[in-house]
Amino acid sequence: MKRKHLYDYVDLEGLHLKEIPDNIAMYACHGAYDIQNNKIRSLKNAPSFVKGNFICDDNLLGMGSGLKYGPEEVQGNYNCSGNKLVSLDGIATLIGPRLTMDDNRLTSLNGLPSSILNNNKSLSFNNNSISNLSGYGFESVEFYEFFFANNNVTSLRGGPNIVKSNYDCASNPITSFEGGPTSVGRNFYAMALKNLQSLKGLPSIIGGTLFLSMDDMLRIFPDYTKNDRDILISTIKDMCSVGRGISIE
């Protein structure tokens, strides 16, 4: 079938599809393209170009051909969370402001498109099995948001130095914040860090709220108890500038 341009929003969400039908194959979608919440294993028949957001969350990508055959350019956000992806092979070369790939089986970010390594972009890969942030060029990029909660990251080295909005490193086996960002424009999420031994390396500037876990703080400050929350907050405030306060739960 000859592929065509479609100047509209494609909505195939939640239709129990196992594949993208041949009869809607198109070269370009000049709106958003949404195939989330199906049972799709291959992006065959997806458009090569998407002007809006490309949304393929909550499918079975990774059990088939992964992201291969998908769009080469997405001018909006690229969302591929909730799949079975073990690699980024086939991901679009050009991606707009945000790439979200939470809840997959990624062990590395090899293949990450260089287009996401530009200032003011957002990257989210929560709930994967990434072990380090080095080698991807993150440190030279001023991200808008940077999220990697619940991975296997042991060090913040190699990550971005400046994040203009929110930064989330919660639930990783880091021992300190050394090598992490020096400035976070909004919130810094650092809860459930069971291996944390020191607050060394905390960003010097946090524009929003610093979120920490009480269990982690009592391990670092063994002379305090849960009743000393205010003292703990005061102690931590001496280490960094926090715009909206410190939350310890």
Region spans (language model):
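Intrinsically disordered, low-complexity coil segments
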Residues: G64-K68, N119-N120, E142, Y224-D230
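N-terminal capping/linker segments that flank leucine-rich repeat
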Residues: M1-N23, D216-E249
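Canonical leucine-rich repeat
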Residues: I20, L43-A46, M63-G70, L88, ...
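Concave beta-strand-loop units of leucine-rich repeat
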Residues: L12-H16, C29-I40, F49-G62, V74-L85, ...
